[in-house]
Amino acid sequence: MEPIGRCVCVCAVRIKSGEVDPMAAVIFALLCVFPPVVPRPASVTSDPSPRLPDVIIIGVRKGGTRALLEMLKLHSQVMAAQSEVHFFDWDSHYQRGADWYASQMPSARPGQLTVEKTPAYFSSRRVPERIRQTTPEAKLLLIVREPTERLLSDYTQVFHNRLEKHKPQQTLETLLMRDGELNLDYKALNRSLYHEHLRHWLSVFPRSRMHLVDGDALIRDPLPEMKKVEEFLQLEPQINADNFYFNQTKGFHCLRQRGRERCLHASKGRKHPNVAPEILNKLYEYFREPNQKFFQLAGQTFDWK
């Protein structure tokens, strides 16, 4: 209110001094008290609101998507959906339309990025085209890890989920092996054939729209991978070494932000089942050629067995 008070005072002084016509001074004073409303820039006046995502973490399942999302949330310009939305891969959700999808996103201001993750997107044939039609400008993040390790992690999650629901269990060997050979119908095996899924995505989106994160490197040393993600998303550099610390008890890196420390859910980092060496060797051999095809499509290599 101070600027208004000073303006009225100037008007009154001018009236007394006779510098201006009294009526003009009164009008001037009224303008000072009730100045014209000048619209503010949208970045100031716009309230936070949900909108379609700017970034989608499309997979892979058990590749480190939750860790990637939590690390992205360290950045002040990132607003992330907390749950997996499954908009593009579940018909029951997709039929609700783009407005419903936007309503599942967190509120964000102009200049902030909205992010969602649904790992099942990567291996779903229908998803790429649906994303292109709904949010064609979205950037895509794909985090991958060594295929055999991903398969073992996939099995471990399903095993514990069934255990919690008191459902019958099957050993990995029962699911993975058939008559002494790999069961090529095992879903967890197919999810690790990254080249097949990536080829379909690249038939819809240019490679430049997608950034590949090395999930194994992210576990060992998060910062270098996160700096690459910041650069791809054109975020100002914020994430730094102080945001991470190694938890000796859990055996992986946890997060630190504004003095608060937090680790991923206890379900992360579960011990994998013991697997016979001959089965592991079969898996490594089976994935060798598909991995090379994936490297060629991706235009980058990974340090896998």
Could you say what each language-model-derived stretch is?
Residues 1-7, 12-122, 134-138, 147-171:
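PAPS-dependent sulfotransferase catalytic core
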Residues 47-49, 175-183, 267-278:
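Short glycine/proline-rich turn/loop motifs
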Residues 54-55, 60-61, 66-69, 73, ...:
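A generic "structured core" feature
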Residues 64-65, 101, 115, 131, ...:
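Generic structural signal for small/hydrophobic residues in well-ordered secondary structure
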Residues 95-98, 124-125, 195, 277:
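Structural motif corresponding to alpha-helix initiation and N-cap regions
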Residues 98-105, 128, 198-199, 291:
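Generic structural signal for well-ordered alpha-helices
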Residues 126-129, 133, 137-142, 149-243:
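PAPS-dependent sulfotransferase catalytic domain
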Residues 199-285, 289-292, 303-305:
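The conserved 3'-phosphoadenosine-5'-phosphosulfate
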